């Protein structure tokens, strides 16, 4: 990238267009931001089920004057449900957002596609095979259902439903870019102890506890995992992962221009299928390392604060910056409390900020139609049947079909049970301009409704 690249790009683009005007350019980066034209940009999404559920409206506000989008790679490859039904629900919801915005998202594909289970370099893959069998993961059936049920036009629609809050575990942590003095850490009224010194060490002093910076061995180990990351910050964790809901507080000595971070939900995450399988099949305990623990971070920079979450290559803000009143050279009591839905931040007993934990919709839908039919695609993320009240602006025939993918969150296909998760089609009755469809728990549904003939 840079001026030389952009100069050559424009020269090549201009000449190719002169000779082959029918060729469309798909760039793998938003080169148009630097004055380089492209008809389409290839965007990739690899993340957790929750990420896709929370970003179903990702393209709603996309600049329609910019290049079209090719979602070239999209898959759940982090978290607890890779290759399983719940991951397919998240991907299905994201695809519904794409379908609503197909004026700008003109192409989409799952990646990777095929996996020889004896020579695997990546997981999950859409279709798995060995020398004798093949199977599709649950996501395969989502793409099949969506591909077989496309309408001619997207219909304006609205849906309402509950929320699914992002599941979090773990207690507090502390991070700092220089030595940090603290004392009297308390969790739900009892002393909270440091359980994991991920970066740096904690030393007892006459004045309390001193969080020291990482030693050279810790820096080297961390740098080997995340080469691009800052290995100079200390990082220690209180308590265990099952200590999630409650109140944490501790006294922190605030120096002039102090910078430190108070972590919330300091638990290990599953970064890949291979880590998960080592835990499940080999009984290998997940390591406690600074790259694997991803709390929400209450960042304190002097008198300015924000709450952020870990993200590659930068942290994502959950709040705008806000000010707190602290006096340098003194201890101040910092704390938080959470019930799994809200986080409340305190300084010296005074509430500073109340934030909702990120959440996605429990119900997501998209509606398309043809001359003769209405097609409704819907995802129910909830663990209960959802009686969905459907209201249409046209009259429908009573008989309709539902293509359904459902089961338990962790259901997956294997060579022993290759079709444990597979779509089925059932005939139903009772459709009209207003009727109720009971969406099964953890399900993707495609309803095909026949319009009544106009007289």
Predicted regions mapped to residue ranges:
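Catalytic cores of secreted or luminal carbohydrate-active enzymes
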Residues: 95, 101, 109, 123-194, ...
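C-terminal beta-strand-rich structural cap/linker in extracellular carbohydrate-active enzymes
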Residues: 420-455
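Catalytic-core region of carbohydrate-active enzymes that cleave or remodel glycosidic bonds
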Residues: 10-150, 383
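Secretory/extracellular carbohydrate-interaction modules
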Residues: 215, 219-307
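Carbohydrate-binding surface patches
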Residues: 361-396, 402, 445-446
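Short tryptophan-centered beta-strand motifs in secreted/extracellular beta-sheet-rich domains
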Residues: 250, 331-338, 343-347
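Short, solvent-exposed beta-strand-to-loop segments that form ligand-recognition rims
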Residues: 348-360
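Short, aromatic/His-centered strand-loop micro-motif at the edge of beta-sheets
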Residues: 310-335
């Amino acid at each position: 990238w840079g001026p030389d690249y952009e100069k050559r790009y424009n020269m090549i683009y201009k000449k190719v267009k002169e000779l082959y005007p029918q060729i469309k350019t798909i760039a793998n980066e938003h080169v148009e931001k630097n004055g380089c034209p492209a008809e389409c940009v290839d965007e990739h999404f690899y993340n957790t089920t929750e990420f896709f559920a929370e970003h179903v409206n990702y393209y709603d506000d996309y600049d329609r004057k910019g290049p079209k989008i090719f979602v070239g790679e999209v898959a759940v490859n982090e978290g607890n449900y890779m290759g399983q039904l719940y991951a397919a629900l998240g991907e299905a919801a994201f695809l519904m957002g794409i379908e609503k915005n197909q004026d700008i998202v003109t192409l989409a594909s799952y990646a990777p596609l095929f996996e020889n289970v004896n020579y695997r370099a990546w997981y999950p893959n859409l279709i798995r095979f060995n020398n004798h069998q093949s199977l599709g993961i649950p996501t395969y059936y989502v793409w099949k259902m969506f591909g077989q049920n496309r309408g001619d036009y997207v219909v304006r629609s609205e849906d309402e439903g509950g929320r699914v809050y992002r599941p979090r575990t773990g207690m507090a942590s502390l991070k700092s870019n220089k030595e940090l003095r603290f004392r009297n850490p308390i969790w739900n009224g009892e002393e909270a102890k440091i359980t994991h010194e991920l970066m740096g060490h904690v030393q007892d002093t006459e004045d309390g506890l001193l969080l020291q910076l990482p030693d050279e061995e810790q820096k080297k180990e961390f740098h080997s995992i995340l080469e691009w990351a800052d290995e100079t910050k200390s990082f220690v964790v209180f308590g265990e992962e099952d200590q999630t809901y409650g109140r944490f507080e501790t006294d922190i000595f605030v120096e002039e221009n102090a910078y430190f971070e108070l972590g919330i939900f300091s638990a290990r995450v599953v970064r890949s299928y291979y880590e998960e399988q080592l835990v499940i099949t080999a009984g290998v305990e997940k390591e406690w390392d600074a790259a694997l623990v991803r709390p929400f971070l209450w960042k304190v920079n002097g008198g300015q604060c924000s709450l952020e979450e870990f993200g590659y290559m930068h942290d994502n803000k959950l709040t705008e910056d806000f000010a707190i009143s602290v006096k340098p050279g003194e201890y101040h009591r910092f704390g938080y409390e959470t019930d799994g839905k809200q986080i409340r931040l305190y300084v010296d007993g005074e509430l500073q900020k109340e934030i909702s934990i990120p959440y996605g919709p429990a119900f997501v839908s998209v509606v398309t139609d043809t001359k003769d039919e209405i097609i409704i695609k819907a995802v129910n993320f909830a663990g209960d049947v959802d009686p969905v009240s459907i209201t249409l602006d046209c009259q429908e025939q009573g008989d309709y079909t539902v293509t359904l993918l459902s089961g338990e969150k962790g259901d997956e296909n294997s060579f022993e049970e290759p079709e444990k998760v597979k779509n089925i089609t059932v005939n139903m009755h009772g459709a009209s301009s207003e009727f109720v469809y009971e969406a099964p728990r953890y399900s993707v549904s495609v309803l095909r409704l026949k319009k009544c003939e106009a007289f």
